[in-house]
From Swiss-Prot:
Transferase keyword on record: no
Species: Gallus gallus
Gene name of the encoded protein: E2F1
This protein's name: Transcription factor E2F1
Role summary: Transcription activator that binds DNA cooperatively with DP proteins through the E2 recognition site, 5'-TTTC[CG]CGC-3' found in the promoter region of a number of genes whose products are involved in cell cycle regulation or in DNA replication. The DRTF1/E2F complex functions in the control of cell-cycle progression from G1 to S phase. E2F1 binds preferentially RB1 in a cell-cycle dependent manner. It can mediate both cell proliferation and TP53/p53-dependent apoptosis. Blocks adipocyte differentiation by binding to specific promoters repressing CEBPA binding to its target gene promoters.
Ranges where the record places region Dimerization: 172-261
């Protein structure tokens, strides 16, 4: 019975439509004995299904091994390819939109806001009906409300009625435009002033270079107190003269805050002088251009009041035609008989006998701001010192007089 049952099961398995590989394991018992049907082990590997009638599943107590043996290749096991994923095939051109459908950018709130502002700018009085705006822009009215709520929150529009709004940005723009025009005018004025200053600086630089490089101007490279008075009036403005070595740094603060002048130099000392107001016979024998002379001097009086110490050859050329008349010899002494014309004369003699005749020459034109020296230099000269020792000046830089 067992053998008949096993044969029947084997026949049922082999009678199927799909091919199977049947493996039968033999028992270790003697050939005379037979095992029951339950001890018979059958292993079958299913093959891929083919179209046709569904085969009958063998009634076995153990499920078939899910393994495929391809005997046509050298390899014993080959992985089975996965079947195609089930589902609807992707229709080509599904993302394409119809010609009448709008894109996402065309329906964006940003573009709608720009178009709404264009409608506001085209309105003569700045009033726009929201219903009319929704029809013109071809958008829903709620999107127009989203725009108006934001614009009203930043105070660019105001509600005139339920569906009418008015633009307020023109008033703000008018105030800003007027201020912008004022700022532009101020900027143009500042640029014109800056160009004028640049031209003046360039002109002064060129003139100063030509003046200093010209050899014929070397003998006149100095400034007198009268030159400064011809520019400004010391009674109204304070004139200060700074004598400093080369590479001196001069810094001037803003006059609007606190006017300060800072002068620094590492090459030598810095001297600052104050140009005083003009007073009769104090600064210089040369008359100030701000005060008319009291009386015209005759040629005879000019001979008497002429300074015995001449500063330049120009003064000599001016005085010689007046002094040397026909039949007149060159005077060798001043009207004061005791005063000598020698440049090596003692300063004491000049102070004692000539101070009445030369009041302007003895007085300093500039007032030194530094404190005076405690020692009296008028009576402290040594035997080897001369008149040049009385002045803090290098007389070697002056041009020699040509008589």
């Amino acid at each position: 019975m067992a053998t008949a049952g096993g044969a029947a099961g084997l026949a049922a398995l082999l009678g199927g439509a799909s091919p199977h590989l049947l493996i039968v394991s033999a028992s270790e018992e003697p050939a005379g004995g037979c095992r029951p049907d339950a001890d018979l082990l059958l292993f079958a590997t299913p093959q891929p299904s083919r179209p046709g009638p569904a085969p009958r599943r063998p009634a076995l107590g153990r499920p078939p091994v899910k393994r495929k043996l391809n005997l046509e290749t050298d390899h014993q096991y080959i992985a089975e390819s996965l079947p195609a994923a089930r589902g609807r095939a992707r229709i080509p051109g599904r993302g394409a939109k119809s010609p009448g459908e709008k894109s996402r950018y065309e329906t964006s709130l940003n573009l709608t806001t720009k178009r709404f502002l264009e409608l506001l700018s085209q309105s003569p009085d700045g009033v726009v009906d929201l219903n009319w705006a929704a029809e013109v822009l071809k958008v829903q009215k709620r999107r127009i409300y989203d725009i108006t709520n934001v614009l009203e929150g930043i105070q660019l529009i105001t509600k005139k009625s339920k569906n009418n709004i008015q633009w307020l940005g023109s008033q703000v723009a008018a105030g800003a435009s007027s201020r912008q025009r004022l700022l532009e005018k101020e900027l143009r004025d500042l640029q014109a002033a800056e160009r004028q200053l640049d031209d003046l600086i360039q002109t002064c630089t060129v003139r100063l270079r030509l003046l200093t490089e010209d050899p014929s101007n070397q003998h006149a490279a100095y400034v007198t107190c009268q030159d400064l008075r011809s520019i400004v009036d010391p009674s109204e403005q304070m004139v200060m003269v700074i004598k400093a070595p080369p590479e001196t740094q001069l810094q001037v603060s803003d006059p609007g805050e606190a006017f300060q002048v800072s002068v620094r130099s590492t090459q030598g000392p810095i001297d600052v002088f104050l140009c005083p107001e003009d007073s009769s016979g104090v600064c210089s024998p040369v008359k100030s251009p701000f005060k008319a002379p009291a009386e015209e001097l005759s040629p005879g009086s000019s001979q008497q009041r002429a300074s015995p110490l001449l500063h330049s050859a120009q003064d000599v050329n001016m005085l010689l035609p007046e002094a040397l008349l026909p039949g007149t010899a060159l005077p060798t002494k001043c009207p004061t008989e005791d005063v000598s014309l020698s440049p090596l004369a003692s300063m004491d003699t000049l102070l004692e006998h000539g101070k009445d005749d030369f009041p302007g020459f003895l007085a300093d034109e500039f007032i030194a701001l530094s404190p005076p020296q405690p020692q009296d230099y008028h009576f402290g000269l040594e035997e080897g010192e001369g008149i040049s020792e009385l002045f803090d000046c290098d007389f070697g830089d002056f041009t020699h007089l040509d008589f």
